Amino acid sequence: MKGEAGHMLHNEKSKQEGYIWGSMRRTAFILGSGLLSFVAFWNSVTWHLQRFWGASGYFWQAQWERLLTTFEGKEWILFFIGAIQVPCLFFWSFNGLLLVVDTTGKPNFISRYRIQVGKNEPVDPVKLRQSIRTVLFNQCMVSFPMVVFLYPFLKWWGDPCRRELPTFHWFLLELAIFTLIEEVLFYYSHRLLHHPTFYKKIHKKHHEWTAPIGVISLYAHPIEHVVSNMLPAIVGPLVMGSHLSSITMWFSLALIITTISHCGYHLPFLPSPEFHDYHHLKFNQCYGVLGVLDHLHGTDTMFKQTKAYEKHVLLLGFTPLSESIPDSPKRMQ
């Protein structure tokens, strides 16, 4: 009996071990296959992008050299065009389209994607004019002088108007570093501005809009504009000694992203603005850009318990998330 019991126990143990090893092999196979598929996909994507970059690189290099010839001896003018005028053109072009919807409610199909339903329908014209004046002041009297002072530092560090354009892989590396630096500097400067000492006199101005619109992304006290808007974006290119082409693309991208974060519409195929929109609604959650530091510091715990968190995804269809994931009746009231 003891022998049979021991034999059965041994068989059972062998079966369990076999099951465990089988599970481990299946897991390893699935993970390995997934990893290989991801690497193959990523290599394919980067190969096609690099091929496109390389094929068009000759064209852009020729155009860049033509610009250098045109502005020879006056590269600082070229720098100001690329670092200020082009990003501002992107900012106002995009916000011009959004302002049409904000002020008229048309086209109707875009209004369906509004995050805070019933707010800014239409936007208060007096409040809007005041905000636009502040944004223009910040751009002309704060951003422009900061870029003026930035140029000699970049010139000393690596010459932003050097003849050779950056490679595709180098620009991707720069973009990753710019994003990381912006996340760190913006998160901590933003949290600092929420300290009672600074909030009432400085940051409260930006939070006048509890339901934000795109153009108010730069609506802020001048001190906040320097510390929390400009510095997080400028430090990256300064550290990397970046080329003007990288600076132009980064500044333009940063302005478009912050506009989307404040626009008040969760539009298809664009980054989700739910995270920062919730910050304007509640004030004490979601301080960062990417949400990484909010996760580490626990400043997104309330957000994760809301419908807004469920909606914080890339919308890949045309059905508004307010319809597919409706708010609870309590909030709708």
Swiss-Prot record:
<dbReference type="InterPro" id="IPR006694">
    <property type="entry name" value="Fatty_acid_hydroxylase"/>
</dbReference>
<keyword id="KW-0963">Cytoplasm</keyword>
<dbReference type="GO" id="GO:0016020">
    <property type="term" value="C:membrane"/>
</dbReference>
<keyword id="KW-1133">Transmembrane helix</keyword>
<dbReference type="GO" id="GO:0016491">
    <property type="term" value="F:oxidoreductase activity"/>
</dbReference>
<comment type="function">
    <text>Promotes megakaryocyte differentiation by enhancing ERK phosphorylation and up-regulating RUNX1 expression.</text>
</comment>
<comment type="similarity">
    <text>Belongs to the sterol desaturase family.</text>
</comment>
<feature type="domain" description="Fatty acid hydroxylase">
    <location>
        <begin position="176"/>
        <end position="299"/>
    </location>
</feature>
<keyword id="KW-0472">Membrane</keyword>
<dbReference type="GO" id="GO:0005506">
    <property type="term" value="F:iron ion binding"/>
</dbReference>
<dbReference type="GO" id="GO:0045654">
    <property type="term" value="P:positive regulation of megakaryocyte differentiation"/>
</dbReference>
<feature type="transmembrane region" description="Helical">
    <location>
        <begin position="168"/>
        <end position="188"/>
    </location>
</feature>
<feature type="transmembrane region" description="Helical">
    <location>
        <begin position="237"/>
        <end position="257"/>
    </location>
</feature>
<dbReference type="GO" id="GO:0008610">
    <property type="term" value="P:lipid biosynthetic process"/>
</dbReference>
<dbReference type="Pfam" id="PF04116">
    <property type="entry name" value="FA_hydroxylase"/>
</dbReference>
<dbReference type="GO" id="GO:0005737">
    <property type="term" value="C:cytoplasm"/>
</dbReference>
<dbReference type="GO" id="GO:0001934">
    <property type="term" value="P:positive regulation of protein phosphorylation"/>
</dbReference>
<keyword id="KW-0812">Transmembrane</keyword>
<protein>
    <recommendedName>
        <fullName>Fatty acid hydroxylase domain-containing protein 2</fullName>
    </recommendedName>
</protein>
<dbReference type="InterPro" id="IPR050307">
    <property type="entry name" value="Sterol_Desaturase_Related"/>
</dbReference>
<feature type="transmembrane region" description="Helical">
    <location>
        <begin position="29"/>
        <end position="49"/>
    </location>
</feature>
<feature type="transmembrane region" description="Helical">
    <location>
        <begin position="77"/>
        <end position="97"/>
    </location>
</feature>
<feature type="transmembrane region" description="Helical">
    <location>
        <begin position="134"/>
        <end position="154"/>
    </location>
</feature>
<feature type="transmembrane region" description="Helical">
    <location>
        <begin position="215"/>
        <end position="235"/>
    </location>
</feature>
